[in-house]
Amino acid sequence: MVRLTVLAGFLLTSAACSACVIGERQAAASINNAFKAKGKKYFGTCGDQGTLSDSTNSAIVKADFGQLTPENSMKWDATEPNRGQFSFGGADYLVNYATSNGKMIRGHTLVWHSQLPGWVQGITDKNTLTSVLKNHITTVMQRYKGKIYAWDVVNEIFNEDGSLRKSVFYNVLGEDFVRIAFETARSVDPQAKLYINDYNLDNANYAKTKGMADHVRKWISQGIPIDGIGSQTHLGSGGSWTVKDALNTLASSGVSEVAITELDIAGASSTDYVNVVNACLSVSKCVGITVWGVSDKYSWRSNDKPLLFDSNFQPKAAYNAIISAL
């Protein structure tokens, strides 16, 4: 059992003003501290200026989580809406917030078929798309070089049957877009961990999980610098039991690390959340967990109530169960 204490500041403020809730931490112990005490790198969450400007949400992030992923501000439509015209307001906010509060950052995401500007989707020339791809990755990564622990270099490039998705990148460049993206990323920031990230990688026997592991194994053998596989882990209720074996399958591909990158679970049962945490703990290459939001209030799946804090920012039973399990 990890021994944890409540922040003294919370106790002092609560004693001084029992009616003051906004801005105070809502959980008795930091899930990040407990997880790191077990040898992992971080237990994090996602956010952007909107949610991080909410004082209650921000207080929980500062007190309980150790890593941040930008929810939308680093995606292509946000950073390069027009060719060669970059916009970093939202991403800068996230990076400045994280660095000033001592949070690790996972950059998300450099190459994705969704939230992709029309001008990129309309490219049909191989040389043009190669140039655009390299320039985008280089410009974004250079801006934050040395501040990002890991980058999701490519995101959601697989179909459910384990084949490669027919995105503009694949249609124009073929499978080689993966090599171009990772080699460019490595040249820009050699210290950053470079990830391939996807969803529905939660069952070792699922075609997509097998396809991911097989392709990554092949790409690594070809010298493509892939450091990690990110499993988003958006789960339905009861979907946690297969996560451990799936992580082991992904880890067997030859990557140096794996991570749970966008965790949320319909219903947020204590059993499901503890199962996922234990899965990461049991897989030596699993370096951390990121939940996809703090409170159900801001969740993209709000109707499923999938997060660790309810819409009033109170910790759920699952949060406390994780602390107890650790």
From Swiss-Prot:
It comes from the Eukaryota. It catalyses: Endohydrolysis of (1->4)-beta-D-xylosidic linkages in xylans. Keywords: Carbohydrate metabolism, Disulfide bond, Glycosidase, Hydrolase, Polysaccharide degradation, Secreted, Signal, Xylan degradation. Residues 46-325 form the GH10 domain. GO terms for cellular component: extracellular region. It is found in: Secreted. The active site is at residues 156, 262. GO terms for biological process: xylan catabolic process. Pathway: Glycan degradation; xylan degradation. Disulfide bonds join 280-286. Induction: Expressed in presence of xylan and repressed by glucose. One of its GO terms (molecular function) is endo-1,4-beta-xylanase activity. Endo-1,4-beta-xylanase involved in the hydrolysis of xylan, a major structural heterogeneous polysaccharide found in plant biomass representing the second most abundant polysaccharide in the biosphere, after cellulose. This is Probable endo-1,4-beta-xylanase C.
